[in-house]
Amino acid sequence: MASSNPPPQPAIGAPLAPSAPGPSPEVEEDSGEAFEFDDSDEEEDTSSGLVVPGLAPERDTEPSLICFDTVPGSDLDPAAAPPQTEAPTVVSNGDAVGAAISGVRRSSWKRKSSRRIDRFTFPALEEDVIYDDVPCESPDAHQPGAERGLVYEDVHRAGAPRETEDLGWSSSEFESYSEDSGEETKPEAEPTKHRGSFQPKLSPDLTRLKERYVRTKRDILALRVGGRDMQELKLKCDCKMTQLMKAAKSGTRDGLEKTRMAVMRKVSFLHRKDVLGDSEEEDMGLLEVGVTDIKPPAPELGPMPDGLSPQQVVRRHILGSIVQSEGSYVESLKRILQDYRNPLMEMEPKALSARKCQVVFFRVKEILHCHSMFQIALSSRVAEWDSTEKIGDLFVASFSKSMVLDVYSDYVNNFTNAMSIIKKACLTKPAFLEFLKRRQVCSTDRVTLYGLMVKPVQRFPQFILLLQDMLKNTPRGHPDRLSLQLALTELETLAEKLNEQKRLADQVAEIQQLTKSVSDRSSLNKLLTSGQRQLLLCETLTETVYGDRGQLIKSKERRVFLLNDMLVCANINFKPSNHRGQLEISSLVPLGPKYVVKWNTALPQVQVVEVGQDGGTYDKDNLLIQHAGAKKATAAGQAQNKVYLGPPRLFQELQDLQKDLAVVEQITLLISTLHGTYQNLNMTVAQDWCLALQRLMRVKEEEIHSANKCRLRLLLPGKPDKSGRPISFMVVFITPNPLSKISWVNRLHLAKIGLREENQPGWLCPDEDKKSKAPFWCPILACCVPAFSSRTLSLQLGGLVHSPVNSPLLGFSAVSTSLPQGYLWVGGGQEGAGGQVEIFSLNRPSPRTVKSFPVAAPVLCIEYIPDPEEEAEGAEESRAATDPSVTVHPTVCLGLQDGSILLYGSVDTGTQCLATCKSPGPQPVLCLRHSPFYLLAGLQDGTLAAYPRTSGDIPWDLESPPMCITVGPGPIRTLLSLEDAAWASCGPRVTVLDAATLQTQQSFEAHQDEAVSVTHMVKAGSGVWMAFSSGSSIRLFHTETLEHLQEINIATRTTFLLPGQKHLCVTSLLICQGLLWVGTDQGVIVLLPVPRLEGIPKITGKGMVSLNGHCGPVAFLAVAMSILAPDILRSDQEEAEGPQAEEDKPDGQAHETVPGPDSHTARELTRKKGILLQYRLRSTAHLPGPLLSVREPAPADGSALEHSEEDGSIYEMADDPDVWVRSRPCARDAHRKEICSVAIISGGQGYRHFGGAPGGLSGRAAPCSETDSTLLIWQVPLAL
């Protein structure tokens, strides 16, 4: 098979002929310093690799400096291969090429060299790997001199000119590397012609690339056996490494970019494997950062210098937390590879196949590479912290690359699949389960494999929290502040994308799991597999069945799936063969349940029914209700009155109180027949007993109602009875907490609205794959209403604001389904005529007009001014607290065309105008904004009028002449109030004023065209988006440095919706909950995602375009927002404990802190002693007659009570007996997250659905004509 006398080996860097002979005996004696090579990539079918007989691969050999997957020889014809070569070489693009270096020479070299070097195995052969992104470097790539350009840029033949072209790999080439390279190879006995017949003809670039690989591989072999210039080469490598580390330490983007590009070019001294056995084929070009002789030092802060400010001390501590957190994270990634992956790959017999190991640990190595590089740069930055104090740019440079997103996306999308493989292996392979248990026991912290693998999913939220803390302690003007804001934006955007991809992956997994539990022939299976279903909500709820008297019959956990058009309920079916084994497995990795579908129904037929609901949503007379588990159906009206769905204990206590009240009433009648007069036994005392019992009953009913905050009652359609009457059955689910119930009610309501024609679809997501759908958080068009009740006049819209008012009369579900509570104030008018103000109530699912009144001139702008306590919790709140007699209510300000400013109270819609004034001039009031110090009015002549805040009933001093500041010669189109500044636009320039003194700080040009004016400004995070009077572009500016950061052309988002439309202008802007709403003069509304945190609100996504719009320009975009009452969020346990805890306190201690651990014991003692049955009567000392008692009479002290307050609880409920207090503020509610109900309102002429004809939808009458002023209201899902 081989010849044993190979000719001499050429020198390093010399061109090698295709038939270059092997090394000579002289070279064999002086082996020099040998290079180590990696083992071949591990595959499940290990027999596919070409291994020299008798030479097994060594696992502990030193990894190579540079890795090659194959040894191609592209310059020879495959048919010319010697007949002895049974396994033809397969190059990376899949071509089978005959070996120019014959099998005779290969095996001879192997026998000669194996006597003095480590054992070596040729890499496993691969196929179906296509390099599809290889750029052509020079037109003369095939000239003989081109072969000398190797990957080693410092290794060249003496006297030969160095190639000037860049032979490295770019990041885009590595990102386009095919992931199919990890596929198993076919048996080597397959004929070459069969392989080659399926491969395309090689391009010249690929041919040149293969030749270069052959040359490089041969020179590496020459280095291995020669090695005479090794010392010189190592010195050059170390020098180059030092230069690159200095570049990384420089802290500039250029230095970091040079380091990254050096690594991407596979610089030899940076390419060394630290993780043994990690030879996956899915390499993305991210190389290990361990160096040959230089190991990067661990990041460590030096001693704290003297004289640091408190903020600098805090920043050092935060930096230490970042270093510690990153070190722990990198160690966890190494543990995954070293403690789990590598042993599983090397285990014989294998507990998990190599293919499954690659799937389970997919992209872990690449994630480790990213963070190892970040740790090197972090180490250099930490060493220089006291002189630079910069770290934001390091985060930007490390995590803004698409490669990081791709690696993490692959890992996150594969996470569910990896856990599924681990779960299945635990159930079917005891050796694998034993391996996991042993590894967990051996670890110091006892963290499971799942606990380690979930850390990459949680990594970026941890970074965000640390950077937020760092940004809070970085003052303005600090060189690191803008970098930190950009870093926060990059991490937030990355985390949002990963969360969305994780949500989609989990959604697909849940639907697939549900589909497996349905028969293939069922209609539900066809619906689930059609690809048209979107999972909106999925949760495990407890289904309960109650009897007629409220007793709990049974309960069982169900998995409930809310799809975009149906509701599915399934049993959670656990069938473990060994219950104990199941528990052991669940402690190592979460087990996914198997489902058995119980029922499913179309979403429009599902109704949410609340306890005490009047039944207006369904017809009681023609409906029978059968409770789940009941054998007999009852009429809806009877069932509504008889069934109580509270806890059995509360229901029993309520019934006992009802019986006791009947007995006490009989006692009262008997007392009225007494002939004597007694101080503590008379009709006054008896009536007080009755009132006290009635109050206890009301409290008990409220407790039952509070318990129902976690009860979701669904009315579902059933089969009709024998007479044909429809039967609906009631299903009661217990949710984990009130938030869960709110979420279910809200999503059910919005999902029904989403099935309307105007929302099918409601948004278009332009994407390359044409498969993306509107996400579940997408706003849904709830209604379309005329802006003005009077249609006789053609009124133009001027502005709109929302005045939030919480209504305590709304029920629990009404809060979840209605629009944000409060009132909409809509202003407008007609040119040359008067104005009109319309007030809508939003305390229902659709708005309705409650008041309309005229004003002297058309309304041009409206501003809502909240309570000072609502607006700011600092100085304003303390100012109001110092003068309790001053009550400042929310107000609404109107700016008119005739220069008038009108002030109205916003709480009571019947309130008359509180104050009015005229602007200087008088000039039309184009815009209004309020700040903590002034009410600012932008006028037509470029003057800014400022009305100072007062401490009277009217919050602004409108009687005195305002402070006037000339901003520019043109009109002030828009104003923006920031924390410490006010921005005013005049033409293309924006002037920045101090918020307190209104002194001009600076000004800048937002647009280069003098004829263009800034028309809109909205703030988000640390940036301000601006729109202009002409053009379709919007621009982003930094609030602190005023730097222009980004420009977006809206026209590119609407070209497919409005083909041929060349001129587009932005007419309105709004930012709300991470979404930038853009209205155009064509009636089209564009939605763009922006970050929500304190970073820079850059736009990175493609956004969405609404198919619902206006026939004319979008006049304004406004937000309606209200916060749900805190008592709604209290769970049933807290509600049950709340009144009971208050019962144990005297009246003067009702608002103290939560009782200690002995409160439960005190309640039990009170219950055993009994309740003092008193309501209004605190003492009977003032009543006539003797005291009926065997004890001595009490001292004649009128202030003394007959009983101690600790014995009773009735009179502590409220000071006024006629007022029923629902709940008192609780300390545990202080930390609760606020839940905002949000709706977006757009105003313009008419309504248009861009998927159909203008003015309406097919088959439905248009709500208004094309010329009427119209409001479109979008409802946003609750952010829980």
Swiss-Prot record:
<feature type="modified residue" description="Phosphoserine">
    <location>
        <position position="40"/>
    </location>
</feature>
<feature type="modified residue" description="Phosphotyrosine">
    <location>
        <position position="152"/>
    </location>
</feature>
<dbReference type="InterPro" id="IPR015943">
    <property type="entry name" value="WD40/YVTN_repeat-like_dom_sf"/>
</dbReference>
<feature type="modified residue" description="Phosphotyrosine">
    <location>
        <position position="131"/>
    </location>
</feature>
<feature type="compositionally biased region" description="Low complexity">
    <location>
        <begin position="78"/>
        <end position="89"/>
    </location>
</feature>
<dbReference type="InterPro" id="IPR039919">
    <property type="entry name" value="ARHGEF10/ARHGEF17"/>
</dbReference>
<dbReference type="InterPro" id="IPR011993">
    <property type="entry name" value="PH-like_dom_sf"/>
</dbReference>
<dbReference type="InterPro" id="IPR000219">
    <property type="entry name" value="DH_dom"/>
</dbReference>
<dbReference type="GO" id="GO:0032933">
    <property type="term" value="P:SREBP signaling pathway"/>
</dbReference>
<feature type="region of interest" description="Disordered">
    <location>
        <begin position="1133"/>
        <end position="1163"/>
    </location>
</feature>
<feature type="compositionally biased region" description="Basic and acidic residues">
    <location>
        <begin position="183"/>
        <end position="193"/>
    </location>
</feature>
<dbReference type="InterPro" id="IPR036322">
    <property type="entry name" value="WD40_repeat_dom_sf"/>
</dbReference>
<feature type="compositionally biased region" description="Pro residues">
    <location>
        <begin position="1"/>
        <end position="10"/>
    </location>
</feature>
<protein>
    <recommendedName>
        <fullName>Rho guanine nucleotide exchange factor 10-like protein</fullName>
    </recommendedName>
</protein>
<feature type="compositionally biased region" description="Acidic residues">
    <location>
        <begin position="26"/>
        <end position="46"/>
    </location>
</feature>
<dbReference type="GO" id="GO:0051496">
    <property type="term" value="P:positive regulation of stress fiber assembly"/>
</dbReference>
<keyword id="KW-0597">Phosphoprotein</keyword>
<dbReference type="GO" id="GO:0005829">
    <property type="term" value="C:cytosol"/>
</dbReference>
<dbReference type="Pfam" id="PF19057">
    <property type="entry name" value="PH_19"/>
</dbReference>
<feature type="region of interest" description="Disordered">
    <location>
        <begin position="1"/>
        <end position="94"/>
    </location>
</feature>
<feature type="domain" description="DH">
    <location>
        <begin position="314"/>
        <end position="501"/>
    </location>
</feature>
<comment type="subunit">
    <text>Interacts with RHOA, RHOB and RHOC.</text>
</comment>
<dbReference type="Pfam" id="PF19056">
    <property type="entry name" value="WD40_2"/>
</dbReference>
<feature type="region of interest" description="Disordered">
    <location>
        <begin position="1186"/>
        <end position="1207"/>
    </location>
</feature>
<feature type="region of interest" description="Disordered">
    <location>
        <begin position="161"/>
        <end position="202"/>
    </location>
</feature>
<comment type="function">
    <text>Acts as a guanine nucleotide exchange factor (GEF) for RHOA, RHOB and RHOC.</text>
</comment>
<dbReference type="InterPro" id="IPR035899">
    <property type="entry name" value="DBL_dom_sf"/>
</dbReference>
<feature type="modified residue" description="Phosphoserine">
    <location>
        <position position="279"/>
    </location>
</feature>
<dbReference type="GO" id="GO:0005085">
    <property type="term" value="F:guanyl-nucleotide exchange factor activity"/>
</dbReference>
<keyword id="KW-0344">Guanine-nucleotide releasing factor</keyword>
<keyword id="KW-0963">Cytoplasm</keyword>
<dbReference type="GO" id="GO:0005096">
    <property type="term" value="F:GTPase activator activity"/>
</dbReference>
<dbReference type="Pfam" id="PF00621">
    <property type="entry name" value="RhoGEF"/>
</dbReference>
